[in-house]
Amino acid sequence: GCDLLLEAFAQVAQQDSRLHLVMAGPDQTGWAATLKMQAEELGIAERITWPGMLQGDDKWGAFYVAEVFCLPSHQENFGIVVAEALACGKPVLISNKVNIWREIENDSAGFVDDDTVEGTVRNLQRWLSLQPKEYVRMSEKARACFESRFHIQRAAERLVEIIRCSIQ
């Protein structure tokens, strides 16, 4: 989905010169060079930071200074990085191929759309159209979504309940 995000960001960034994108994560497949070339061709290279894999305080710091987290993934079994963003109170913009999209949508913890450039553009535009109060409310809902669904204590309680039900 990184290619989709670059295409969508290029379209949306034309409307707001303040936008900046951080493309963080490991380059396990050597795809970063191709993505950087795509960013050059789209004319957005100067508006993107490529820190690579972020860990520890660097990762958490990046989450906390971000306004929103965007993952237009083609396929995610769970999306731990989405849960991490929610834990930091960051709304998420994800594709409907991230397997926790229903929880995000049900809890109003972000926006969900198709796994396409158009869907990613819609997510970004919806995000940018929020009023400050709406942004604050969605941030609160993002954190609440994490606490109620993905916090380790809550997950352990659900697992124990599933086991109890299965042995009765």
Describe the role of every protein-language-model region.
Residues 133-149, 158:
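A short, well-ordered alpha-helix in the C-terminal region of glycosyltransferases
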Residues 20-34, 52:
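Glycosyltransferase donor-sugar binding loop
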Residues 33-54:
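Nucleotide-activated donor-binding/catalytic signature segment of Leloir-type glycosyltransferases, i.e.
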Residues 91-95:
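Short hydrophobic beta-strand element within catalytic cores of glycosyltransferases
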Residues 1-11, 21, 33:
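A conserved mid-protein helix/loop that constitutes part of the nucleotide-sugar donor-binding site
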Residues 74:
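Aromatic "clamp/platform" in nucleotide-sugar-dependent glycosyltransferases that forms part
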Residues 53-54, 61-66:
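Short alpha-helical donor nucleotide-sugar binding micro-motif in glycosyltransferases
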